[in-house]
Amino acid sequence: MSVALRLALQEERAEELSQRVRRLLGPFTGTESVLDAGCGTGALAFALAPHVAEVVGVDLRAEYLDAARERAPGNVRFIEGDVTALPFEYGSFDISACHRVLHHLHRPELAVSELARVTRIDGRIFLADQLGSVDPLRSYEMDRFERLRDPSHQRLLPDADVRGYLDANDLVLLTSDVTRERVDLERRLDLSGVSDDERAKIRGPAPAAPYEVEVGWYVSRKPGRG
């Protein structure tokens, strides 16, 4: 996804994301140290920053990090790193988050395991991502379309897969929600600078416009060892 598209979507969703973060993760004490794994251009980090002591954003793409640093408040810092092999010690954060990232990863289960590892005992793990269909054919067609639109796309996870990753790491699900989000495909293609030829290829398998997607939101707790 281009930096321009990320920043445009970030601006559009900023207030909604801020409200949702406060509802799902609040109330905050103001002393929390938070990880934003796969931070992109900083959408989640900036939503959390007013409520916590520190946010550390991690991403592999330097152009995203550069754009994020230009807009960062004083309690937010960004470093280059891999969300499936995080450069932090066990229990480094009070809250570890991964927002709209899992579908970009070859091994999303490794990212969830890493989030669990770097979160302190009784800390929280926050996941959010577009969800895949339980119907194999629909899932295949949607992933095919998403890869044409964004080559970094790997696979949309069904709700059951996300819950399975949480269970596999002995995380206790505190709350979850599924919301519907309308997608303006033409505007996204405009912001991405897609050529006319590429647009034609993307429109072929695209869902009928306008279309909606489901987004899953999950907050879990890391329990103490028995």
Residue ranges and their predicted role:
Residues 172-226:
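Conserved Class I S-adenosyl-L-methionine
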Residues 1-32, 43-47, 64-67, 71, 126-148, ...:
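Conserved class I S-adenosyl-L-methionine
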Residues 109-121:
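A short glycine-rich, Lys/Arg-flanked "PGG" loop and its adjoining helix->strand segment in the class I
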Residues 35, 41-85:
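Class I SAM-dependent methyltransferase SAM/SAH-binding core
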Residues 97:
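A conserved beta-strand element that flanks and buttresses the S-adenosyl-L-methionine
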Residues 100-101:
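Short catalytic micro-motifs in class I SAM-dependent methyltransferases
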Residues 155-169:
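Short alpha-helix
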